[in-house]
C-alpha cells in the first residue's frame, strides 16, 4: 500500500513537472512578443494604488522593454545585463550586477518569457500549479537579502502567454501587472 501511495505521488509530481516543462517549452518558442500592460502598485502609505500603463516588448533571448505611456512617459530597456531608464530628458544606465536585489525581479519575467526553467531555479524556489491552459508559477527568492524585501513573485498565464505578474513584498506592498494583447 505504501509503495502504491509513493508511486502515485511520484506520478503526480512527474505530471506537474511535465506540464511545467511543456509551458516552458512553449514560452521558449516565442522569439518576439508585444503586449499592453496595466500596473497597479499598492503601497501601505497610500490609500489608492499607483496606476501606470503602457507596452511591454520582448525579443529573445534577453531584450525586454517596458514603455510606460500613462501617467508619464518612461522607458525601461533591458539588453542583456544592461538596464537603461529613460525619464523625460534624463537617461540612467546600470548593470544588473550592480544591484543584486533588482536582478531577480527583472530575471523572473525575462527568464519566464524565455522559457528558461534552469535560470529561474538558480534564483527562485519554483512552484508550478495548474494546467497547460491555465497555469501559475510561484517564485520564492533563494537569496536571503532578496527574500527580506520580497516574499514571492507570482506569474500566471495560459499556454505561451503570460497574463499577470504579481510581486509581493514582505512589508505588505505589492505590484500587480496585468498583460493583454495589443
Walk through the language-model features, giving the residues of each.
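Flexible, surface-exposed loop/linker segments and immediately adjacent secondary-structure boundaries
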Residues: 89, 93-136
Amino acid at each position: 500500500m505504501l509503495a502504491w501511495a509513493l508511486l502515485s505521488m511520484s506520478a503526480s509530481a512527474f505530471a506537474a513537472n511535465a506540464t511545467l516543462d511543456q509551458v516552458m517549452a512553449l514560452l521558449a518558442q516565442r522569439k518576439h512578443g508585444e503586449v499592453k500592460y496595466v500596473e497597479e502598485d499598492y503601497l501601505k502609505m497610500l490609500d489608492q494604488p499607483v496606476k501606470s500603463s503602457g507596452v511591454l516588448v520582448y525579443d529573445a533571448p534577453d531584450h525586454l522593454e517596458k514603455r510606460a505611456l500613462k501617467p508619464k512617459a518612461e522607458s525601461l530597456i533591458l539588453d542583456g545585463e544592461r538596464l537603461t531608464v529613460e525619464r523625460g530628458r534624463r537617461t540612467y544606465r546600470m548593470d544588473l550586477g550592480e544591484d543584486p536585489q533588482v536582478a531577480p525581479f527583472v530575471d523572473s519575467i525575462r527568464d519566464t518569457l524565455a522559457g528558461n526553467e534552469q535560470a529561474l531555479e538558480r534564483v527562485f524556489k519554483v512552484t508550478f500549479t495548474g494546467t497547460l491552459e491555465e497555469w501559475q508559477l510561484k517564485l520564492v527568492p533563494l537569496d536571503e537579502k532578496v527574500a527580506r524585501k520580497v516574499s514571492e513573485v507570482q506569474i500566471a498565464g495560459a499556454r505561451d502567454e503570460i497574463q499577470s505578474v504579481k510581486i509581493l513584498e514582505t512589508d505588505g506592498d505589492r505590484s500587480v501587472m496585468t498583460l493583454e494583447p495589443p
